Each structure stands twice: as C-alpha cells, then as structure tokens.
C-alpha cells in the first residue's frame, strides 16, 4: 500500500473515532509526578483504590524512563473490570515519545473511562502532558483534573542543577504536593525539604511559593477526607524558565537482565555501588530477583534506603537510574 493510501486510510479511521468519541462525556485526566524514588507508584495504588471505591471506571497509563517498565508489574493487583493498565515505554527520542503518548490517549479515549491516571517516569518533561492535551482531538475528549506531585520528605539537601529543575517543574503546576515517608522524617527534615522546593522554584524564576498545598502526611496516613480534598485541588498554571534536558544529556538508565546473583548479594552490592562516586550519581535502583527458594523479590533502592520485599510476580531485570552513569563500573558490582 502506498504512503498516500496509508495516510488516507488513517484519516478515515481517525474521523470515525472522532465521531464515536464525540458521543461520550469528557474524561478527567490526572498527572501524578515525583522525582526518582519519591513513591509515586505506592501513592497511585492508594489513589486508584480510592477512585475504585467511589465506583469509577479508571485507566492507568504507565510511562517509564527507558525501555523496560517495572512499575507496571507493581500495579497488576489493581487490574479488574473497572481498572485497566496501559504502558508507554521510553528509550526513544522526545518527538517519538510524544507521538506514542498522543496515540495511546486517543485509544484510551474510546474505552469509556471516568478517569485516566498518568504516571510518568521520575524524569519527565511536564510540558509534554499539557501540550499533548491541547492537541486536537484530545482537547475535546479530555479535561485536566489534578496534577499531584510526590516528594520525599527526606529530600537530599544538594542536587544538581538538572535535578533541581525537574523538581521545580514537577511542583510548579501541582494542585497537591504529598510528602512521602513523612512519618520517618523529623520536623527539621520536612521543613528543609519545603525550603528546598521553594529554592528550586526560585532558581527557575517561578513566582510560586509552596506551603498550604503541601500535605505533610505519608500516603499510608491519608484518610478518605484527605483524598476528597486532593480530588478537588486541581492544578495551577505557572510560568517558569525552561531547561532543555536533552541538551544536557545528564540522565541515564542502565538495564541488567538475568543477573546471576542472589537477593542478599544484590542488596549488598547495590549498597556499595550507590556509595561509589566512580559509578556516577545514582538516584535509584529498582527491579526484581529470585531468592534461594525461587520466589520473586522486589528491589527498591534510593539514597535513603534499600529494601528487598517479596512480590507475587516479577521480571529478571535490574534498572539503574541517575546522572552521568558509568556502565563499566556498575557492571563490576552486579555481574562479578
């Protein structure tokens, strides 16, 4: 089939989709952001359950940084008649990713959802979300509901310029900001995190300063009344100075498949690796490994903690995410 005929066929299909979609009510769409390891997926499980308990039919769109989506596996227990999971893999250029995102939203727009939740990676250009939703026909199908940002209550006091930019860009438009692990943080750590957020906003010339929008509660402590409030908080349209992260080439993700390493040894090696400056600036390590009994274990490592917990299903992959990563050095810890 010629390129012209393919385009003509696509135009006919899209026109029919628009006609069918026009008969349905607009779908609310939420964006839930958070820097690497902040606890987005944990929060989404609780938020999705809250929406399901209200009788809503929801779709969750997972978008990971890189070609393998680990978080998709962590949300599988939500799947059912009223909750479906979709995925966009990263590992592609900006324009390709935007096209995939738009195409996926067009498909999901025909599913009759009451609400769609978008969970991007911890390294995400928030402008993509708003820009795509202003494209035709999505601007007539979707209505932006909430922008929710998850921030670790024990946020590192010093981050790179690029990392601070991501932090600010994710917080600038948020209607609600949730401090994850707040129950583990001291009052001083929480106040330092809020100061860091506002300092990051100032650095990108954003006039917004955060205080009342911040819920100083961990996701596990949020009540139904708290979620009622979050559901109504919406988002804020703020301006700030943009940074082209692609030009910086600072953030990387490395994948290690089918490692011949025990769960205990993996946890030990990851702890050493994250302390080794020769490996680069590692923000997050996540993935799955089998224990001695053949059961799946979930690895989750940040600068604050390293956990290894049982999980029903997994995939033999470990993902390392950070800045200026040195693959050869990291490989020595994981493969030797």
Predicted regions span which residues?
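Conserved C-terminal guanine-recognition region of P-loop GTPase G domains, centered on the G4
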Residues: 123-124, 130-145, 150-205
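C-terminal accessory "lid"/substrate-recognition subdomains
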Residues: 173-179, 184-312, 324-327, 335
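Short, conserved catalytic or adaptor-binding loops enriched in Gly and charged residues
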Residues: 76-80, 170, 204-208
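Nucleotide-state-sensitive switch-loop elements of NTP-binding domains
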Residues: 27-33, 38, 42-160
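C-terminal engagement modules used by replication, chromatin/transcription, nuclear envelope/ESCRT
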Residues: 313-321
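Short, hydrophobic beta-strand segments that form beta-sheet elements in well-ordered domains
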Residues: 59-61, 286-289, 320
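Short, positively charged and aromatic/hydrophobic N-terminal segments
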Residues: 3-18, 22-23
């Amino acid at each position: 089939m010629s390129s012209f005929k393919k385009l003509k066929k696509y135009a006919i299909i899209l026109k029919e989709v628009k006609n069918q979609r026009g008969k349905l009510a607009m779908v609310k769409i939420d964006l839930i952001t958070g820097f690497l390891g902040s606890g987005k997926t944990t929060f989404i499980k609780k938020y999705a359950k809250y929406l399901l308990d209200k009788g809503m039919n929801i779709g969750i769109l997972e978008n990971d940084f890189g070609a393998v989506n680990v978080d998709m596996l962590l949300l599988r227990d939500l799947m059912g008649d009223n909750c479906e999971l979709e995925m966009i893999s990263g590992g592609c250029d900006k324009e390709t990713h935007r096209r995939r995102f738009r195409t996926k939203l067009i498909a999901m727009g025909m599913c009759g959802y009451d609400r769609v939740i978008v969970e991007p990676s911890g390294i995400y250009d928030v402008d993509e979300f708003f820009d795509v939703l202003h494209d035709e026909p999505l601007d007539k199908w979707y209505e932006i509901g909430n922008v929710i940002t998850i921030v670790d209550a024990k946020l590192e006091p010093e981050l790179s310029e690029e990392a601070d930019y991501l932090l600010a860009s994710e917080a600038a438009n948020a209607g609600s900001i949730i401090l994850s692990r707040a129950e583990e943080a001291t009052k001083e750590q929480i106040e330092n995190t809020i100061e860091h957020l506002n300092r990051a906003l100032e650095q990108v010339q954003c006039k917004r300063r955060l205080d009342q929008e911040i819920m100083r509660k961990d996701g596990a402590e949020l009540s139904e009344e708290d979620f009622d409030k979050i559901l109504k908080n919406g988002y804020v349209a703020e301006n700030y100075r943009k940074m082209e992260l692609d030009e910086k080439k600072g953030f990387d993700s490395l994948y290690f498949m089918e490692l011949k390493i025990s769960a205990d040894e993996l946890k030990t090696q990851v702890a050493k690796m994250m302390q080794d400056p020769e490996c680069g600036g590692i923000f997050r390590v996540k993935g799955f490994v089998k224990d001695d009994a053949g059961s799946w274990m979930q690895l989750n490592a940040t600068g604050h903690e390293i956990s290894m917990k049982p999980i029903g299903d997994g995939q033999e992959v470990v993902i390392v995410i950070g800045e200026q990563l040195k693959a050869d050095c990291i490989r020595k810890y994981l493969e030797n």
